[in-house]
């Protein structure tokens, strides 16, 4: 290893901010470092509520993104009796290198899913629900009508606030907006995930500008509904790029923001390049609020649906 590479290695190891690196400078050699203390999760002693939620999901043939995506917040959220439901099956038609959700040929749509979802939400007695989905590029509408069917079924049985976290629908914005007109959510969420420079590596099946256009178009047509988006950090993005993405989101009508740390689900996924210190997350939140966001959740374990009700409820009440 030459002096330049050796110097970089020592800097990385000293700061202990990088978990795994796979770069040309290291000849694609994997270097593993311990996770910092702020990344470690405490498992609750009482797991009864967790088992109860999992049982309800299995009973009604439902999926949660909490389980499918190996979310680090599962113990906390399930213990509070909350879950983010994942519709349209458990197999994604894309294979993003950061995501733990299964991919491959998807199953046919479960027409009973909207009713099963509504019943489960009623049985759980929750007042705020987040619904997301796998990407279904095989469907003409990307699954938009199924989202609407779920929203309608839930509203028939429950007086709950509904947040949806949607895919990009392959850029078919005009069609999607028309479909959602018959069943609108309380919050519309679509994640840009990372900075545009890294899209080919991080989000190869997506287009940054199309994601912004989806968020902008939804807000223009349904101006009374808050729009939301999120970023995951630690993949090689620069501070200036993060700020620019936040400005892009805000200028396209987004008022709610989530920013979290990317955690590598397995050795087969894209490696973490940097663990973001807590102080940097605080600075990112400060910057987001100065840009104009109504609310910004920023921290290592923040995910799109993490404490979603706390973030959105004040804003929804104002509408």
Curated annotation (Swiss-Prot):
Please give the pathway this protein is involved in. Answer: Protein modification; protein lipoylation via endogenous pathway; protein N(6)-(lipoyl)lysine from octanoyl-[acyl-carrier-protein]: step 2/2
Q: How is the cofactor bound?
A: Binds 2 [4Fe-4S] clusters per subunit. One cluster is coordinated with 3 cysteines and an exchangeable S-adenosyl-L-methionine.
The Radical SAM core domain is annotated at 78-294
Record's catalysed reaction(s) = [[Fe-S] cluster scaffold protein carrying a second [4Fe-4S](2+) cluster] + N(6)-octanoyl-L-lysyl-[protein] + 2 oxidized [2Fe-2S]-[ferredoxin] + 2 S-adenosyl-L-methionine + 4 H(+) = [[Fe-S] cluster scaffold protein] + N(6)-[(R)-dihydrolipoyl]-L-lysyl-[protein] + 4 Fe(3+) + 2 hydrogen sulfide + 2 5'-deoxyadenosine + 2 L-methionine + 2 reduced [2Fe-2S]-[ferredoxin]
User: Which leading EC class covers this enzyme?
Assistant: transferase
Report the main location listed first in the record: cytoplasm
Give the protein's recorded name: Lipoyl synthase
Q: Which organism is it from?
A: Buchnera aphidicola subsp. Schizaphis graminum (strain Sg)
Ranked from the top, the taxonomy reads: Bacteria, Pseudomonadati, Pseudomonadota, Gammaproteobacteria, Enterobacterales
């Amino acid at each position: 290893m030459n002096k330049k590479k050796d110097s970089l290695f020592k800097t990385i190891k000293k700061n202990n901010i990088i978990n795994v690196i796979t770069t040309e400078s290291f000849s694609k050699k994997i270097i593993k470092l311990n996770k910092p203390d702020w990344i470690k999760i405490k498992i609750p002693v009482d797991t009864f509520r967790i088992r109860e939620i999992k049982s309800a999901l299995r009973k009604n043939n439902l999926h949660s993104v909490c389980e499918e995506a190996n979310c680090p917040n599962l113990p906390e959220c399930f213990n509070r009796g909350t879950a983010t439901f994942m519709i349209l099956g458990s197999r994604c038609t894309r294979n993003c290198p950061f995501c733990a959700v299964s991919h491959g040929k998807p199953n046919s749509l479960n027409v009973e899913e909207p009713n099963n979802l509504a019943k489960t939400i009623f049985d759980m007695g929750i007042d705020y629900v987040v619904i997301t989905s796998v990407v279904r590029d095989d469907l003409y509408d990307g699954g938009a009508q199924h989202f609407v069917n779920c929203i309608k079924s839930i509203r028939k049985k429950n007086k709950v606030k509904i947040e949806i976290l949607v895919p990009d629908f392959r850029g078919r914005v005009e069609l999607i907006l028309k479909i959602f007109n018959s069943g609108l959510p309380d919050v519309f969420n679509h994640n840009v995930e990372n900075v545009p420079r890294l899209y080919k590596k991080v989000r190869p099946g997506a287009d940054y500008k199309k994601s912004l256009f989806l968020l902008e178009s939804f807000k223009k047509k349904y101006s009374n509904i808050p729009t939301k988006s999120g970023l995951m950090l630690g993949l090689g993005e620069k501070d200036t790029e993060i700020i620019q993405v936040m400005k892009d989101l805000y200028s396209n009508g987004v008022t709610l923001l989530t920013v979290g740390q990317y955690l590598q689900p397995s050795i087969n996924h894209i490696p973490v390049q940097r663990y973001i210190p807590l102080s940097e997350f605080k600075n990112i939140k400060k910057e987001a609020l100065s840009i104009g966001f109504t609310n910004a959740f920023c921290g290592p374990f923040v995910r799109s649906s993490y404490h979603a009700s706390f973030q959105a409820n004040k804003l929804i009440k104002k509408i």
